[in-house]
Amino acid sequence: PWDFDYGNVLTVIGGYKFKFRESKWYQRFRESTIFPYISWIPFMVSDQLEISFRYSYSGGRPYTPKHYNFRYRSWFINPAEDLNTARYDYYSRLDIMILRRFNFKKINLTTFLDLHNIFDKNNVWEKMYLDNGSIEWAYQYKQMPVLGIIIEF
C-alpha cells in the first residue's frame, strides 16, 4: 500500500446553536444584577451558545518495519522485503467545543472551550528506532483543553 493508504476514514461533525438573545426570559436575566457575577461560568447561558463535536476515525497507517543490526548498531530496511507491510493501530478522536457569544453596544465577545481527544486515546504518530536497538512509540497529543477569548470591534 501507499504511505497514506489508511483503508477506512470516517469523520462526523455536528453541532447546535442556541439563540437565547431572542428570548424574553434571557433579556430579563441579562438586565438583572446577578448576570455580571455569574456570566463567566463556562456553561452559563449567553446571547448565543454553540455546542459542536467532531469525531474522526481512520484505519492504521502503513509503515515499513526496520531491522536492527547489532554489529553496526544501526537500523535498516531489508531491500528484499516489500514496503509498507505493517500498519499502525487505528486512529480515533472526539473533540467537543462550547462557544459563547455576547453582543454589546460596541464590541462582541466570544469565549470558547475546546476539548481535544476526549477519550484520551494514545494515537500513534510513529515508531522511534533508537540507537541501542530498542523501539519507543511517539504519540500524538492526548487530551488537551483549549480556552480562548475573541473580542470583535
Model segments located where?
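Extracellular loop and loop/strand-boundary signature of outer-membrane beta-barrel proteins
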Residues: 1-2, 37-39, 81-85, 132-137
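C-terminal beta-signal and adjacent terminal beta-strands/loops
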Residues: 30-32, 42-49, 54-76, 89-93, ...
